[in-house]
Amino acid sequence: MENLTNNTNFKPLTPDMHGLADYAFAVAAATVPTLLDADKKVIRIYQIVAGGVFLYGALSKHRYALKPVIPMDAHRKIDLANLTGIALLSGYKKIRKDNKSLAFNLALLGIGIVNVMLTDWNNKTT
């Protein structure tokens, strides 16, 4: 077996796995801010983020999609735009000034980045 530490292109997530991870990401974005007792506007922002991620995830071409019409290459580009928006949310005063909200935002951003970076976008098994 090839040594995984020497493989600079190690991408263990298939598009199907990425799709499932996106659903979990959306659930976390929709629920965790409420559990953290975040500001009502912050909760609403993350509910909108969650809805968007769920929507384009459910429409992307992977095994667990509800209606697979969006190619995964386009999905990747939407992910990158979405993650840019989440990064910018760190500067929003109601998030920046609340340690729990800021920590959640940075964790969500980190998880999203890892999910995108570890996905084998060229895997056409779906």
What are the residue ranges of the model-derived segments?
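Short amphipathic, positively biased membrane-proximal segments
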Residues: 1-126
